Each structure stands twice: as C-alpha cells, then as structure tokens.
C-alpha cells in the first residue's frame, strides 16, 4: 500500500497544486508522502510562494523536518484556503463522504477542510467502502468533562462507544485541543444527516464524518489511479 500512497500523492500534487496557493495540510501516513513530494517540488523551484496551514502537531513536525515554513496564526486568514489536501480512513465514492479521525486530528482537519475551496483527498484502495462504518468506527471529539454524558446518550441510542486509549502512555488519548475521543461503531446510512445530528449534542466538539461541498478524490484501484 505504501507505493499506492506515493503514486496518488504525486498525482494529486502534479495535477492540483499550483504556485501562490494557500494550502491546508492534513494528517496521516498518506500526507507524509505528499509533504515529501511537495518538498522536492519546492526545492526544485517548480512550486513557489506556497503558504501552509497545518492540522496537527504531527504535520508541523513533518513540515519542519523538510524545512518547509508553515503559518501558525490562523487569525491572519480572511478568506478560504485554495485547497486542503488530506487522507481518509474510509471513503464512500458515490456521495464523496468520508470518515476521518483515526489519527486524532479530525477537529482541526475539518476546520481547515471546510474553510477551503476544495478538499483534495488522496487514498489507497483499502479506504474505499460501500458504506461508512464498514471497517472503521466513527471518531467523535468530546470535551473531557462531557465524556460521561455523551457515552450515556450513545448507550441510550444502542451504539457502542469506546474511549480511545493512548498507545504510548497510560490513559485516554488527548487531542491537540485537549479533548478526548470516542470511537463509535455504527453503519452510516445518511452521512450528511448523521454529521449534522451528532453536532447538536452539547459536549461533542466534532464528528469524523466529512461532507465537503467540493471534494475531489484521487485514489488507487484496479492497478491504476482514478479520480472522483
């Protein structure tokens, strides 16, 4: 799958990213390859005057490692970004709906994505599903003091929710925004309706279902790169 990620990252950048753009940069393993290729194009001079807006501390680290400067102060923005480039955990091609958030950064990923003219998704073939929730749970970022209330609400809806535990240390995963993450097992019949419904719960900061109005998907399938 690593080769597929490299191929789609290079294709997407070659076909969509132009000099003088304001870019949102997502989080995840596929984005790692996008950053590496962006670095090559910047150093060669084929891409110039790009401004980068990041979605996580991990992405900031990767950009710094490639000596790519990024913007830390979002308050300077007074218009939408040109493109947000990101990966996905699951993709429903027919509706261009996504699950994101297994990397724990979906709140800022959605802030960047929904304030960009285009959301450009790059993915290998394992991310394509016929129904959201087939392989992955739905990540929900929750205020720490609200986690008990939210878990009770989800149980009343007969949904199985698990508090995400950090692999590197004892205790729950804490996001860059100092919140917890609940992973909810459910098959999503109506992605747009589900996204809107869960955002009504006090204490839920963001749900990892994405329905951007202008999503472009570059993915690998059947031994070739495809677009949707």
Swiss-Prot record:
Active site feature: 109 (proton acceptor)
Lineage: superkingdom: Bacteria
GO molecular function annotation: ribose-5-phosphate isomerase activity
Chemical reaction(s) catalysed: aldehydo-D-ribose 5-phosphate = D-ribulose 5-phosphate
Keywords: Isomerase
Residues at which substrate binds: 27-30, 86-89, 100-103, 127
InterPro entries from the UniProt entry: NagB/RpiA_transferase-like, Ribose5P_isomerase_typA_subgr, Ribose5P_isomerase_type_A
GO BP field: D-ribose metabolic process; pentose-phosphate shunt, non-oxidative branch
A GO CC term assigned to this protein in UniProt: cytosol
Known EC number: 5.3.1.6
Family matches, as HAMAP family: Rib_5P_isom_A (MF_00170)
Subunit details: Homodimer.
Family: Belongs to the ribose 5-phosphate isomerase family.
Name listed for the protein in its UniProt record: Ribose-5-phosphate isomerase A
């Amino acid at each position: 799958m690593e080769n597929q990620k490299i191929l789609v990252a290079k294709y997407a950048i070659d076909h969509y990213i132009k000099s003088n753009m304001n870019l949102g940069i997502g989080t995840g393993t596929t984005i790692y390859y996008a950053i590496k290729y962006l670095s090559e194009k910047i150093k060669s001079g084929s891409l110039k005057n790009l401004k980068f807006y990041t979605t996580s501390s991990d992405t900031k680290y990767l950009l710094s490692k490639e000596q790519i400067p990024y913007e830390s102060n979002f308050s300077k923005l007074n218009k939408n970004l040109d493109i947000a480039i990101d990966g996905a955990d699951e993709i429903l091609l027919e509706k261009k709906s996504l699950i994101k958030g297994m990397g724990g950064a979906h709140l800022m990923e959605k802030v960047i994505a929904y304030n960009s003219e285009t959301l450009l998704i790059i993915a290998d073939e394992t991310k394509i599903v016929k129904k959201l929730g087939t392989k992955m749970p739905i990540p929900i970022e929750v205020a720490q003091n609200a986690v008990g209330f939210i878990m009770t609400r989800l149980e009343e809806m007969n949904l199985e929710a698990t508090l995400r535990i950090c692999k590197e240390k004892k205790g729950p995963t804490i996001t860059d925004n100092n919140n917890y993450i609940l992973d909810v097992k459910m098959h999503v019949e109506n992605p747009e309706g589900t996204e809107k419904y869960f955002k009504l719960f006090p204490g839920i900061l963001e749900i990892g279902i994405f329905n951007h109005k202008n999503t472009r998907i570059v993915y690998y399938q059947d031994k070739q790169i495809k677009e949707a």
